[in-house]
Structures are given as structure tokens and as C-alpha cells.
Amino acid sequence: MLKTRLKQSRAISRVVRRYACSHPISPNLDKYPVGLKLHGYEVTQTSPIPEFSLTAVSLKHTESGATHLHLDSPNDSNNVFSIAFKTNPPDNTGVPHILEHTTLCGSKKFPVRDPFFKMTNRSLSNFMNAMTGHDYTFYPFATTNSKDFENLMDVYLSSVFEPQLNHTDFLQEGWRIENQNVHDISSKLEFKGVVYNEMKGQYSNSAYYFYIKFLESIYPSLNNSGGDPKKIVDLSYEGLLEFHSKNYHPSNAKTFTYGKLPLEDSLSKISKYYESFEKKVSSVDVKQPIFSTDKSEIFDVTIPGPVDTMNGKETSEQYCTSITWNLGNPLDPNMQYDIFKWKILSSLLFDGHNSPFYQELIESGYGDDFSANTGLDSTTALLSFTVGLNYLTKQKVDNFNEKVMEIINNKIIPELSNEESSSYHGRIDAILHQIEIGFKRHKPDFGFGLLSSIVPSWVNGVDPIDTLQVEKILSHFKEDYKQNGLRIFKELLEKTLCNPHSQKFKFTMEPREDFTKQLVKDENLMIEKRVSELTEDNKKAIYEQNLELAKLQLEDQNTEVLPTLTIDDIPKRGDFYAIDLGQVNKKVVHERVVDTNGLVYANALKDISYLPTKLYKYLPLFNNCLTNLAGTENTPITELETKIQMLTGGITFSSKISTDPYNIEQLKLQYVLSGMALKEKSSSVYDLWLEILTTTKFDTSDEVLEKLSVLIKNMGQNQINNIADRGHSYAAAVSSSKLTPSKYISDIVSGLSQVQFVMELNSKLESEGKEYLAKEIIPILQEIQKYVLQGEFRYRLVGNQEIIVENEKLIEKFDKDISSNRPTLSLTVTDGLSALLNSFNYNHTSENVLVNLPFQVGYSSLGKIGSSYSSKDGASLQILSQLYSFKNLHSKIRESNGAYGGGLTYDGLNGTLNFYSYRDPNPVKSIQTFRDSLSYGLDANWNDKDLQEAKLRVFQSVDAPINISSQGASAFFENIDDYLRQERRENFLGTTLKDLRDVTEKYLVDNQNNLVTVIGDNEILNVDNKWQIRNFQV
């Protein structure tokens, strides 16, 4: 998987995400003294990390020089392992990325094609992956099972240190030339390959394209680790082998363990793999950015880029530009405190309605959205600060530097100089409060989060223990801020952004209407050139080579050589979370009494099925408005935003569909309030819920209309970007919307229908201006507010006993206050959900829909209806989906067809089956594969081992660790209590091969209705008249 950095969000969590977690334990420092020798390693450093309640142990392998970091966390059962390598890409062929894929295609100890994927069926891991960064590659997994941990570590270590790296794996995962029909030598030759198609998909995302080209320009020595599709086809098999030999050596390895399992056992296993390697002197080759190799003060680069055909803007208004300052080298240990200060400052300048760059560049209408590279970034040896915008005219691009400096000099510097009454003081307190909350908040993926935060700098020579010791830097900052106030930030700006001699890099992407077509044309020219150089013998050899590859992809593998867990490793009884049912004002309160480290988690929920269905599509906009419009009657949004961050860990307002676990044709539309806070600030959650829900300003003032205009534009852009990243989910939403009422509503509020609706809002806003908002949208938002205030809430609390008791009193007051603020409204039940349920058509015939969007690769879905959560059939279908995926579809969709991913998923709660492909060069072909596979379960010769593997895969998610705040949540939100969860667990465990054949026949074969959706470019796909083509109108 390519690890990318696209800043789609400017949330405050960006400042604190690497710090967010805590585990209440007291590590033992005496366990691993410095100098202790363990299995060829020597302990070089042992240090407490009190902010995370960990002990960090750093070790060095004496013979090879390999380093290991262990984070001892005796009370966390979710153990993590990783091995990372420094992998500077030598060019733009994507060799680190392709190697990441091919190492996992079989090894000396496990000579099975794709052991990585096959281990997902033999494990209870809750996380398994491999990731390629700018100049590093790492292979992490997490599991709560000690036997599983040992098995997976063995597979990972064998994969990276003794991979087979067969030529056929290179062809499959990297790139190859192949006949369009692999069995027809006369058919057209084309480029294929998993990574090749993945990167074609990435390049379809304009935000990714802008960012990766920016990085290539500002950091030319680093090269593109993911690979440029034009260059991927230049990589040779020999080049792959050479890159592995050079980089995948113990001297270049960083291994990591986290959790409660014995360090000694891990080191013993790792050191055995190191024995076969000769000692090798290794030095860290840190590539330098353009600022280090060219001492110029100003750099200016312009490149051509794609036009976004979905946002309704003229080509001349689609320039993207950014200005970046060089802040120094983040690998310098003396820079760590400056980096922390820059994180705080970056949040002040960019995050939220209070931030000056947001106010002056987005709200003012100068641009629509920040560019993907905006903000503070640490990439290898470059710490940079960037201000960038999307959707500008050429004139605004030319004036952009002047505009940014005007904001800095006329707004930011004066505010930083206003020590006595600056609004920045409150915002800084809010940021520090979020960090404090982060230390206390429990997250089940804590270990992996720490790993992700240290790897990029660790492979470049930074001590990871220093990176983890946040408390020292935080204490330093608090003291510095107490003594010097805002001056510390003013001085940062004066030394860098305001310094006329600071190195500055301007990067612009100029829109070209023919850009996407040119990419396709270039690909065709590349393949034509390659083909023109082939002799008939060459073509025959390619044909035979690919026939052999296709044959290999279909061959059964001897998976007996792989380690595995068994059904006996799955606990027969699942976790039960004791829930007390309290009562406040005759309203039920679900109470989960558990240690939450001083935090309270609160929810309020009500049934709003009476809401007229015509208002459903406006719910996401309404929810967004509550915390992003102009604020409330008493609190402007700038103050409200700071108040939320200073007093709580966050509050949200959302709507959700809850399907009856016993009947997929019955559901409720619910409205949910959520909040989290420190115990001593609990009352703030309820005060803010009340104020926001009852007094948010939905009037036609200029301020409200301006905010609403910006919000709608931002929603549109975010949704468009999401399609390229999650196209298979959107395709599935379209297919499933014809199957059940819950999926129909889901498409309206979060699927392609919602995207289309927001695009229509933007189109009308563009043509009619803010008068349209005042006349059409504001009255609807006011109407929804009235509806949401109808009905009664019920409540949920998670915390210790003292917190629960205190919050019951707070809920009692909130409930009385919210009830007294209920407006008079006549509810017409016939307009609501019941009318939709009564009229829903369950008898859709098969149909094929192409959603015509300009993507180089496509996404496909074939949907069918299933059964309820509580039914035995539902459990069998969940297991069936795993067998279809790993025994049939994976090889056909990914390995043969070259899509990045594909399979069959089952939504157990909503009862829908979905065949899918992701980043697929031929999604229409995948649809035919799905059709051909419908009866596969009747003919497959599955055995008990196959059934066991499918059950293991299902239980990876069933038994995955969850947040403390989620314990018992399904009983409150979905009416699924522990006993029903246990019943479904027993249905999983009791599923037989006969059950699988029965549900195959009943739901896949006998049900002939296939709801098909493909998202892609019809100029490439050229579908026939059997397809309905759905064009997005703007």
C-alpha cells in the first residue's frame, strides 16, 4: 500500500494525533538494564515514557548493527510488530512500492504464492499491511493472540529477508505487456499490473497529482517511491532484485515490538533470520531537498495539470498554487522544540473559523479550498511551511505571494503583538487542552499509532525514544509560553516567513483541458512504441509468458506450509459488557461503568422517523451547519469553536439509519448527539449540546449566508475528492440503494446521490448567488431544526461510577431544558419514514448503470439482497463472502485482471451482498467475472480447512479490540445486546459447508436480480446500449 500524505482536513487533531492515547500502567524500568545482552542484542537505552505509561527499550544487534525498539505495555493485549527499511527510490519507477508487493508473494520458508494474503485467513490479526513511504518501507501487523503473533512474525521476516521474488510475481504485481484477451494472441497488447493500475488510479486524483508533483519539484533527489505510471514500465526485473539486495539487509533494518508479550521471544526469532547475512557497514543516506543543493532564495515552478470537470468552474478558474518556506532540517535534534512550536502556530493560522488564513483566503472567496500541501510538513530532511489554494484565476496566482504576505504582516503579526487581548491565547489553551485529552483517551490501535509516528524519522537517524518523549517538550513550551507569551511565535515568523532572505518555493499547477486525455494518449503511444519494437517471436513469447502467468494464478497452492490458528483459538464466548439501565425524567440511560482515565463519554439519541423524506438529503448539510455556520444567538462561531476545544474532547451532531437486527425491511432514522470531556468539565458537553441545537443562527444575515456559501463549496470539493479514493464504496451504494430501504437512504445522505445533490447546490449557488440560499436553503434548515427538537431523547454514559452519578444529574437538567425549548410543530407521519417503507419497491429487475466520471481506472459493484443480522443465514453469508473472496475472486480480479482489489463483502446489519473491484483497469470485465461466479459456491470443493479459514477471517473483525467508549454501544444504537451478539457468534462457529451451499443457492443463484454499477470514464470503457449511463450534471 502506498502511504500518502494528503491534507484533506485542517482539524486540530493534526497537531496532536501522534500523541493521542494513554494506558494506565506502571512499567518496570529494572527489567531491561542498559548493557543487558539478549539473543545477540545489547540494550543501549531504557527510558520511561510517563505520558504514555510505557517503558521504551532500545537495542542494537551486535553482529549486524540492526536496531530494535520495544515499547513495554504490560496491560495492552493488542501487540504490534513491524520491520522497516530505509528505501531511497533511485528513480520514478516505483521500485520500493513494487518490491513491497513482491516480497509478500512467497519466500524460502513459505514457498506459497501470496502468503501475505493467505495468512489473512489463518490469523486473528486485527491489522496486517505493508506500506511504502517517501524513503522508507515498513511491514506492520497487530494481534491479541500470542501464537498468532509468532506465526505472523515468522511470515513477515521470511518474506522480507528471503523472498522468492519470482519473475512472474514481478509481472503480476509490477507491470507487464499482455494481450487484452490473454487467450487471444491477436487481441490488442496493453500495459497491466497491480501497482501500475494502482498508480494510474492515484494520478486520477487531482489533489494527489498536485502534491506528488510538488514533492518531486521541491525534493527532486527523493524521487517518487510510489511510481509514475509513465516510468513504472521502465523498471526491469533485474532492477527489482538489485534494489532488494541493496536495501533489505539487517544493517538497514529497524524492528519494533509493542505490547505485553516477552521481548526475549521476539528477539530470538529476529536474530535467527540475521544469522545468514554477512556483516555490512551501513550508513544513512539522507537525500536533501532543493533548498540544500541550490542556495537560491526564490524558486518558481509551474506544471500542467488536470481540469476538474465536476466542480462547474471554468478552466481559467482552476489554477492551484502554493508558497513554501524552508524552516530547517527536522532530523536535527535541536529542532524538536521548534517543530512543536510550529505545530501550534500552524494550527493557529490554518485550523477553523478563527484562523487568519481561513478567514482571508477561504471565507473571503479568494480561493475555494486549501491545497493538499498546505500547512506544516516534515519530509525526510525538510521541515516546511506551506500556504496554498485550489481554484484560482491566473491573476490571483500572480498576486498570491503578495496576498499571503499582506495577511502575515497586516493581520497575523499585529495579533501576535497584541499580548494583552489577543484571541490567540484562548486558542492556544484549547490546543493544550486537546493534547491533555489525547494523553487520556484510549485507542485500541495505540501501538500502531506510535509506530507510524516514529518510522519516518527513525529510518533517517533520529532517536525514536526522543520522538516519543512529548511531555518534556510540552513542559518546556508551557514554561516558555508563560514567560514570553505570543512573542515566541512572532519570533518564529520574523526569522522565517517575514525574513526577505528566507528560501521560498512557489509551485503552480496550470489547468489543461486535454490533460486527462493526453495521459491516455501518452499511454497508448508508449504501448504502440513498445509493440512496434517487437518481432513476431517476441509477441509469441509475451503471449506464452502471460498464459503461463494466468495458469499459475489459477493453480492450487500447498498452504499447509503456512502456520495457522484453528477454530480452537477462537473463544467460544465473546466479550460481555455489563450495562446498567438508569432513569432520568422517565428516560432510559444506558450506563457502562468502566475506568476511562478521568473522561466521560456521553450520547443522546432520538427517533426522528417522522422527518419528511424530502428533507433527508439536507441532513448532512444541517449537521455540518451546527458547528460550522455563524454560531449561536449568544456565541459567534469563532468563540464557539474555541469553547468546544477548550472545554471538551469534541462534540458531534449526526443522523444515522438503524436497521432492525431481526428484519432488514424495518428501520429507524435516528438523531445522535455525542460528546466527550474531562470529568471536571462534563457539564460543558450538555451546555454546548443545548446551546447549539436550540439557538444556532439560521437567518438570512450576510454573515450566515457567507458562511453557508463557503460550507457548501467545501462539502462539494471534499465529496468529489472522496470518489477517487473510495469509488468502490460509492458504486456499492448505488447498487444497494435498490435493495433495501436503509441502503436507499444511505445513498441519499452519504452516497453518490448526496454528491450529486451537493453539486447541484453549488451549481445553483454559482448561478443564482446567495439569494438562492436565503430563499430556498435557510427555510429548509430552519424546518429541520424544528423537527430535530421534537420527540424525546434517551441517553448513554461511559465512565467510572463517580462520573456516572455526576452526569446523571447533568442529563436531568439537559433533558428538562431541551424539552422546554421544543417548538410547536404538527407532525404528519405519512410524510416520514413509514411512507417510504410502505412504498419501497423490493422487486427491482437486473440493471446495469455506468456512472460516467473521468477516472483512468474504474470501480465496479454487483449487489444482491441478503438476510437479517439475527438470522442463521446472515452468519452463513458473512462466512460465504470470505470464501468467495480469498478462494475465487482475489485471483481473478487482482491477479489476473490487474485491479488493486476485489472480492465479495456482506453488510451483516443491513443485509446486502456486494461484489466489488477497486482501481480496476477493466471494471466491465469484472462484472462479467462476478456474474460467472454466482454459482461458484455450489461447485466449489471446499473442505473443513477452507471453512476454518473463512471463520478465522470473520472473527478478525468480530473480536478486534474496540474503544472503551464503544463498549456496549451496539445495544444502545442498534438494539443488538451482548446476548444477540453471542447468538450470532455461535451461528458463525456453527456454520457448516452445507449451510454455505444452501445460502449460495438461495441468495446468489435463485435470486436472478443483479444490481450492477460501474464508475469510470465511458470514453475508455465504451459500454454498449445495455447500460444506463448516468452523467453528473453541473
UniProtKB/Swiss-Prot annotation:
<dbReference type="InterPro" id="IPR011765">
    <property type="entry name" value="Pept_M16_N"/>
</dbReference>
<dbReference type="GO" id="GO:0004176">
    <property type="term" value="F:ATP-dependent peptidase activity"/>
</dbReference>
<feature type="binding site">
    <location>
        <position position="198"/>
    </location>
    <ligand>
        <name>Zn(2+)</name>
    </ligand>
</feature>
<keyword id="KW-0378">Hydrolase</keyword>
<protein>
    <recommendedName>
        <fullName>Presequence protease, mitochondrial</fullName>
        <ecNumber>3.4.24.-</ecNumber>
    </recommendedName>
</protein>
<keyword id="KW-0482">Metalloprotease</keyword>
<keyword id="KW-0496">Mitochondrion</keyword>
<dbReference type="Pfam" id="PF08367">
    <property type="entry name" value="M16C_assoc"/>
</dbReference>
<dbReference type="GO" id="GO:0005759">
    <property type="term" value="C:mitochondrial matrix"/>
</dbReference>
<feature type="active site">
    <location>
        <position position="173"/>
    </location>
</feature>
<dbReference type="InterPro" id="IPR007863">
    <property type="entry name" value="Peptidase_M16_C"/>
</dbReference>
<dbReference type="InterPro" id="IPR011249">
    <property type="entry name" value="Metalloenz_LuxS/M16"/>
</dbReference>
<dbReference type="InterPro" id="IPR055130">
    <property type="entry name" value="PreP_C"/>
</dbReference>
<dbReference type="GO" id="GO:0004222">
    <property type="term" value="F:metalloendopeptidase activity"/>
</dbReference>
<dbReference type="GO" id="GO:0005758">
    <property type="term" value="C:mitochondrial intermembrane space"/>
</dbReference>
<dbReference type="GO" id="GO:0016485">
    <property type="term" value="P:protein processing"/>
</dbReference>
<dbReference type="GO" id="GO:0008270">
    <property type="term" value="F:zinc ion binding"/>
</dbReference>
<dbReference type="GO" id="GO:0034982">
    <property type="term" value="P:mitochondrial protein processing"/>
</dbReference>
<comment type="subunit">
    <text>Monomer and homodimer; homodimerization is induced by binding of the substrate.</text>
</comment>
<keyword id="KW-0809">Transit peptide</keyword>
<keyword id="KW-0645">Protease</keyword>
<dbReference type="Pfam" id="PF22516">
    <property type="entry name" value="PreP_C"/>
</dbReference>
<feature type="binding site">
    <location>
        <position position="101"/>
    </location>
    <ligand>
        <name>Zn(2+)</name>
    </ligand>
</feature>
<comment type="similarity">
    <text>Belongs to the peptidase M16 family. PreP subfamily.</text>
</comment>
<feature type="active site" description="Proton acceptor">
    <location>
        <position position="100"/>
    </location>
</feature>
<keyword id="KW-0862">Zinc</keyword>
<comment type="function">
    <text>Degrades mitochondrial transit peptides after their cleavage in the intermembrane space or in the matrix, and presequence peptides; clearance of these peptides is required to keep the presequence processing machinery running. Preferentially cleaves the N-terminal side of paired basic amino acid residues. Also degrades other unstructured peptides. May function as an ATP-dependent peptidase as opposed to a metalloendopeptidase.</text>
</comment>
<dbReference type="Pfam" id="PF00675">
    <property type="entry name" value="Peptidase_M16"/>
</dbReference>
<feature type="binding site">
    <location>
        <position position="97"/>
    </location>
    <ligand>
        <name>Zn(2+)</name>
    </ligand>
</feature>
<dbReference type="InterPro" id="IPR013578">
    <property type="entry name" value="Peptidase_M16C_assoc"/>
</dbReference>
<dbReference type="GO" id="GO:0051603">
    <property type="term" value="P:proteolysis involved in protein catabolic process"/>
</dbReference>
<dbReference type="Pfam" id="PF05193">
    <property type="entry name" value="Peptidase_M16_C"/>
</dbReference>
<keyword id="KW-0479">Metal-binding</keyword>
<feature type="transit peptide" description="Mitochondrion">
    <location>
        <begin position="1"/>
        <end position="26"/>
    </location>
</feature>
